[in-house]
Amino acid sequence: MAVRLCDVASLLRSGSWAAEPWTGQVIAAMETQLSNGPTCNNTANCPNTINNCSSPVESSNTEDSKTNLIVNYLPQNMTQEELKSLFGSIGEIESCKLVRDKITGQSLGYGFVNYIDPKDAEKAINTLNGLRLQTKTIKVSYARPSSASIRDANLYVSGLPKTMTQKELEQLFSQYGRIITSRILVDQVTGVSRGVGFIRFDKRIEAEEAIKGLNGQKPPGATEPITVKFANNPSQKVNHTILSQLYQSPNRRYPGPLAQQAQRFSRFSPMTIDGMTSLAGINFPGHAGTGWCIFVYNLAPDADESILWQMFGPFGAVTNVKVIRDFNTNKCKGFGFVTMTNYDEAAMAIASLNGYRLGDRVLQVSFKTSKTHKA
């Protein structure tokens, strides 16, 4: 059933594909595969194909899922047209979509390809799954139809050793079920791991088992227990019970000016759930379309914007900060807002700073809930 790799390589050499910066790497990968032979143990089932033998494709029972594929780990600069052309070399495509960030427009590294013929979808999996493009090894599998059993299967993991690789992260979690995607967040400047990652399982029950088995445990190379929890989705109603249990660590204390300012804060004034909900309707300029808006509560009266920049800046790109002040006294009213461009970075900041002790105050940090700000 597999399409010959030499045919795909020849197709890539022709037309506009020849000029693409990563086309040569694709062809080289295919020719290496052809010269070295199949890499999987069962050579009879995968002649001249690139396959991820450690993650066998699982077929679904519905006809739609037999033609609809999900493609993970795509190069950041790959366009939707290039994705369509690559998979169109296998067979006729009904639709193709590269998933992009709703705010920045940047590729999220995965997409969907829907074929006319189920046989072409199967050929695409056998031919292109495991293909290396630039620094990425793409993963091609059947897209799963939506159901309650697969929703909310995305986990947020913090406290990871900075030396842990994405492969090691998957090895740690793979014992609990089939992993769909994984990611470790790195500093955009240094490229060093931030010790935070995401794991998406095939089913929610697998994610639940991973939480039971790994939350609070020390993986190899770790000096402190890791925290494993369901990733917070800003499109859902905020679960304040879960937020109150988010990751805290004595190592997450900020030195320098932030520590000096923290010494000035002396009063702790806890906030009720109803209080947080009632403030969610405040109109913070730019929150609807410029990024993910974060609500920060329990700031001291003399808190200013600089402390929010210093707190949230290490987690990613911050586009705006605002401390809400009393009109008469010009003192902080106890809360403020931070806007970050990237959801993963915003989620990491929330997980790290919710419950963070700033002087004698314990901060409450969550996504700002608003009818006008939807995921």
Curated annotation (Swiss-Prot):
Q: Which UniProt keywords apply?
A: Cytoplasm, Developmental protein, Repeat, Ribonucleoprotein, RNA-binding
* SUPFAM superfamilies attached to this UniProt entry: RNA-binding domain, RBD
Q: Could you state one GO cellular component term attached to this entry?
A: cell cortex
Q: Which GO terms describe its molecular function?
A: RNA binding
| Cited Gene3D superfamilies | 3.30.70.330
An example of a Pfam family matching this protein is RRM_1
All residue ranges annotated as the RRM domain in the record: 67-145, 153-233, 292-370
Q: Where in the cell is it found?
A: Cytoplasm; Cytoplasm, Cell cortex
Give the protein's function.
Binds to poly-U elements and AU-rich elements (AREs) in the 3'-UTR of target mRNAs. Required for the vegetal localization of vg1 mRNA. Probably required for nervous system development.
The UniProt subunit note reads as follows: Part of a ribonucleoprotein (RNP) complex, at least composed of elavl1/elrA and/or elavl2/elrB, igf2bp3/vg1RBP, ddx6/Xp54, ybx2/frgy2, lsm14b/rap55b and, in a subset of RNP complexes, stau1/staufen. Binds RNA as a homooligomer.
What NCBIfam families does the record tag this protein with? Answer: ELAV_HUD_SF (TIGR01661)
What family does the entry list? Answer: Belongs to the RRM elav family.
* Name of the molecule in the record: ELAV-like protein 2
Name the encoding gene, please: elavl2
